[in-house]
Amino acid sequence: MLIFLEVKYMNFHNRKLDEELIDYNISLRILFTILSVAIIMVAFDSLGSSVSDPVGDALCKLIKVFRGNTAKGIAVVGIIVLGIQTLRGKLQWEVALVVVTAIIILFKAPDIVNMVSSDNNSSSCGVS
C-alpha cells in the first residue's frame, strides 16, 4: 500500500512539474513576442531619423548588418542545412517553415512596410 501511494504521489509531482514548465514556456513566448514587437517598432521608427540621432544611427547600422552580406550568408547556410536534412530524410517541416518564414521576413520586411504605409519618403537606412 505504501509503494502505491509513493508512485501515485510521484506521478502527481511529475504532472505538477510538467504544468509549471508549460506555464513557464508560455510566459517566455509571450515575453519574447512583446520584446520582438518592441524592437521592430523602435527599428522602424528610427528609419526616418535625423543624422544627429545616435540611437537611430546605431539601429541603422544594425539593420544594415541584418540585411547585408552577413544575413545573406546566414540565409544560404540555413538553406544548405535544410537541403542536407532533406537528403538524409531527417527534415522536420516545422523547422523548415520557421527558417523559410524568417528569411522571407528578414529580406521583405521593408517592402511590406512600404506597401502598408502611405508614406512615400524613402529612408536612407538599410540595404537595398
From Swiss-Prot:
Subcellular location: Cell membrane
One GO cellular component, as annotated: plasma membrane
Keyword Calcium: no
Record's keyword terms, sorted: Cell membrane, Membrane, Transmembrane, Transmembrane helix
Transmembrane regions listed in the UniProt entry: 30-50, 65-85, 93-113
Listed InterPro entries: TrbC/VirB2
Topology in membrane: Multi-pass membrane protein
Protein name (Swiss-Prot/TrEMBL): Uncharacterized protein RP192
Lineage: Bacteria, Pseudomonadati, Pseudomonadota, Alphaproteobacteria, Rickettsiales
